[in-house]
């Protein structure tokens, strides 16, 4: 493992001699390899190194962000709380029995420095139901930040000897909690493909890597988009859209079939789903 490398570049991934170059301590180093796994995130060099003519991207940027606060306070509940309110979305999550993470839907124009801890806790209280509000413990923040939300997919996910995985290939809004799940499944498919290649001299897994990943990716993208659309206020929602959200939430709570579908997608579909 090499840390604090700079000027990382991938070369000849569509040719016979794939390799990676990087600079460290004033020297240029080269790593020769059979394959390159592009697990370097949304802003990494791997996807950016693919010619524009060889890749297609799909993206939706949502018109709001999540203001997150981390604090050493007892969680309001041991289960996640998702709140859809007239004031916007809120999420309560526990990191441990003594540390909690909370989120508020805010406009993209908001600035962290304009949100005091007191203002955050007051707004969170306004978005919680009376029972949760009663159990809310407040305290000084350890960290506050605003994260934009987007849906993004790049196709395909393989270019010769270069494989994209995780955020390098796709982003989901955090509402559905599917980002790490998708990254792990990408790596699982890639591990199996490389194991078959080196153990059995089979390229079947390599050749089908992108299609297998993307089938799962788009299912998770659909769920994350749907859940985000359901739980948040959009500028164009209007009175009719608000009623549709309320009806959908009522259906989820009172229909066993709908609840099962939500649970199946939230937990994460099995690796061989639909195979």
List each model region and its residues.
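Hydrophobic transmembrane alpha-helix bundles
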Residues: 37-44, 98-103, 121, 136-146, ...
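Conserved mid-domain beta->alpha element of the FAD-binding
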Residues: 38, 146-226
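C-terminal helical "tail/cap" subdomain of flavin- and related membrane-associated enzymes
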Residues: 177, 192-275
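Conserved FAD-binding catalytic core of PHBH/FMO-like flavoproteins
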Residues: 3-11, 15-149, 154
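Short intrinsically disordered, low-complexity coil segments enriched in acidic
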Residues: 1-4, 233
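A generic structural signal for solvent-exposed, polar alpha-helical segments
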Residues: 48, 70-72, 95, 108-109, ...
């Amino acid at each position: 493992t090499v840390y604090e490398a700079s000027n990382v570049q991938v070369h000849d991934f569509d040719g016979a001699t794939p390799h990676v170059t990087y600079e460290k301590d004033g020297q240029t180093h080269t790593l020769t390899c059979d394959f390159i796994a592009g697990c370097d995130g949304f802003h990494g060099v791997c996807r950016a190194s693919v010619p524009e003519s060889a890749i297609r991207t799909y993206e939706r940027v949502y018109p709001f962000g999540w203001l997150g606060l981390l604090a050493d306070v007892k969680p309001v509940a041991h289960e996640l709380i998702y709140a859809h309110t007239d004031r916007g979305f809120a999420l309560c999550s526990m990191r441990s029995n003594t540390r909690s993470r909370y989120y508020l839907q805010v406009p993209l124009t908001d600035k962290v420095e304009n949100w005091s801890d007191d203002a955050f806790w007051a707004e969170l209280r306004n978005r919680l139901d009376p029972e949760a509000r009663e159990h809310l413990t407040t305290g000084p923040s350890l960290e506050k930040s605003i994260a934009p939300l987007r849906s993004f997919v790049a196709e395909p996910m393989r270019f010769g000897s270069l494989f994209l995985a995780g955020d390098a290939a796709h982003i989901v809004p955090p509402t559905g909690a599917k980002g790490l799940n998708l990254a792990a499944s990408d790596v699982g498919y890639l591990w199996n493909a490389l194991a078959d290649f080196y153990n059995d001299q089979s390229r079947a897994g390599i050749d089908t890597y992108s299609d297998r990943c993307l089938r799962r990716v788009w299912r998770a993208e659909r769920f994350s988009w749907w859940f985000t659309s359901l739980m948040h206020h959009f500028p164009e929602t209007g009175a009719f859209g608000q009623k549709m959200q309320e009806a959908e939430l009522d259906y989820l709570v009172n229909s066993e079939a709908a609840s099962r579908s939500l649970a199946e997608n939230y937990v994460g579909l099995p690796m061989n789903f639909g195979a």
